[in-house]
Amino acid sequence: MQKTRFDELVDFPCHFTFKVMGVASDSLPDQVVEVLQEHAPGDYSPSVKPSSKGNYHSISVAVRVESQQHIEILYRSLSDIEDVRYVL
């Protein structure tokens, strides 16, 4: 893992909000929470917003992260969900 300026700007542990965008499905929020529970157990209440045409959902959830590496693991794991298109 490369040391970046990001390391200087963020004090860990902290809460980090992930925004996951994917194909609209009733199971997507549960899949996101399942991945989060695997890597960062906690009580999550994701916020779900549908796109204007209803084809996609944007899911926002705050997660307590321990390090930059922890954030990167979560990004990769969330991106691996089949219906996910973007993770911000």
Curated annotation (Swiss-Prot):
GO cellular component terms, semicolon-separated: cytosol
Signal peptide coordinates: none
Entries under InterPro entries matching the protein: UPF0250_YbeD-like, YbeD-like_sf
PANTHER family: UPF0250 PROTEIN YBED (PTHR38036:SF1)
Family indicated by similarity: Belongs to the UPF0250 family.
UniProt cross-references to HAMAP family, sorted A to Z: UPF0250 (MF_00659)
The name this protein goes by in its record: UPF0250 protein IL0958
The species this protein was found in: Idiomarina loihiensis (strain ATCC BAA-735 / DSM 15497 / L2-TR)
